[in-house]
């Protein structure tokens, strides 16, 4: 396979950095959809077959979109830099049905879990301290239902009793960088390079069931919940592999450090990883047996499970530069050009697997031409890259 490839096509709508991408494979739709958010508060719902927007929405005052999560029942949770988590309908009306204040002073996303009909749980950074976690429960029918279950949770004291490798100097875990969920367990990646997995039980206790130091002392940049494990990335050139089965049993014993319980069998830390041909990995996805990795330097690579490089994608910046000095300075301009990264920054990454779409309802389409286009699209897996210049590139895998 040629290691350098151009995109099959590019979606153009956003005028600013595409800060998050989210594929929606909804049972009522004839084909997968894509949601994109940008640095000026715009959200767009895309028809991937016709390659054009279905509808779009701009949040008042144009705050940067931090993260997107599809909840259920046609609701999209949107975190923005106005310190708000909004729940919007994606039926074209973009009606806001709920709003929660959330700390967005750091890089962290958020996590929403469904508890019951209309009831949800929110895990996010503490409103004042980005090194700790708040947990809320609420019902979408009432703004007054918002209840903070835990305030300012910190895990450092609970895990400080664990045996750390020689050379570790850990006096705190740092700010929360990333949240995700895997088989009901909540995972958070920390600035110190630790990944911590915990459960919430009925009596309000927090159970720590997993701890990894695989990226210490480098910060966690991304977490991806795959089919078999969770993958993590950092500023180093390795991908952390987090398998909860090696640290979890039917009913483990816990040591109490109220309100946090630490699993007694958790006497050692996980450090399973694979080295990859790229560093500063800001975004990570896995599609079937393919690993998608994007760096801070604007490169995206595709590898197989043996970390064999299969493809590399990048987008060049505009080479036109404006020099306001009327006399100019050829030497300084040449030095500046050489020192700058020629690639456009990757600001978001998403993947679409052909296997995830095999049960799609595209056969209900009565338009023969549309049905053929859907079939051709779903035959392939796709690497979808959002760039700092607002473009969204689609690469066939």
From Swiss-Prot:
One of its GO terms (biological process) is chromatin organization. Component of the ASTRA complex involved in chromatin remodeling. Gene3D superfamilies: YVTN repeat-like/Quinoprotein amine dehydrogenase. It is found in: Nucleus. Residues 332-356 have a biased composition (Low complexity). Keywords: Chromatin regulator, Nucleus, Repeat, WD repeat. This is ASTRA-associated protein 1. Component of the ASTRA chromatin remodeling machinery complex. The lineage of its organism: Eukaryota, Fungi, Dikarya, Ascomycota, Saccharomycotina. InterPro entries: WD40/YVTN_repeat-like_dom_sf (IPR015943), WD40_repeat_dom_sf (IPR036322). Residues 324-356 are annotated as: Disordered. WD repeats lie at residues 16-56, 212-252. Belongs to the WD repeat ASA1 family. GO terms for cellular component: nucleus.
């Amino acid at each position: 396979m040629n290691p350098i490839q151009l995109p099959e096509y590019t979606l153009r709508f956003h005028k600013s950095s595409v800060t998050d991408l989210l594929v929606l494979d909804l049972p009522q739709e004839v084909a997968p959809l894509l949601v994109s958010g940008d640095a000026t508060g715009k959200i767009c719902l895309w028809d991937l077959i016709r390659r054009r927007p279905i509808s779009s929405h701009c949040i008042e005052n144009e705050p940067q979109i931090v993260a997107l999560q599809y909840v259920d029942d046609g609701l999209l949770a949107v975190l923005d830099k106005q310190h708000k988590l909004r729940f919007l309908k994606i039926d074209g009306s973009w009606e806001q049905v709920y709003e929660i204040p959330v700390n967005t002073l750091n890089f962290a996303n958020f996590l929403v879990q469904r508890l019951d009909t209309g009831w949800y749980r929110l895990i996010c950074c503490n409103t004042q301290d980005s090194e700790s976690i708040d947990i809320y429960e609420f019902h979408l029918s009432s703004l007054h239902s918002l209840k903070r279950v835990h305030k300012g949770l910190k895990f450092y004291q609970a895990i400080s009793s664990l045996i750390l490798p020689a050379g570790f100097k850990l006096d705190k875990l740092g700010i929360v960088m990333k949240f995700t969920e895997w088989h009901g367990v909540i995972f958070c990646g920390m600035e110190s390079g630790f990944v911590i997995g915990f459960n919430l039980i009925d009596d309000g206790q927090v159970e720590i069931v997993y701890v990894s130091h695989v990226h210490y002392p480098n910060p966690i940049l991304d977490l991806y919940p795959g089919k078999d494990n969770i993958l993590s990335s950092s500023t180093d050139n390795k991908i952390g592999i987090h398998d909860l089965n090696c640290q979890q049993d039917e009913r483990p014993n816990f040591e109490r450090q109220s309100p946090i319980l630490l699993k007694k069998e958790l006497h050692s830390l996980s450090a399973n990883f694979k080295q990859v041909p790229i560093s500063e990995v800001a975004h990570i996805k896995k599609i079937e047996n393919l690993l998608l990795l994007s760096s801070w330097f604007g490169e995206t690579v595709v590898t197989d499970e043996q970390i064999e490089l299969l493809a590399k994608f990048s987008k060049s910046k505009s080479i036109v530069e404006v020099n306001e000095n009327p006399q100019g300075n050829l030497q300084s301009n040449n030095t500046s050009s050489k020192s700058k990264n020629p690639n456009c920054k990757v600001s978001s990454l998403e993947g679409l697997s052909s296997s995830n779409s095999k049960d799609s309802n595209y056969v209900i389409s009565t338009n023969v031409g549309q049905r053929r286009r859907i079939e051709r699209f779903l035959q392939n897996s796709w690497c979808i890259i959002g760039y700092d210049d607002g473009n969204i590139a689609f690469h066939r895998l």
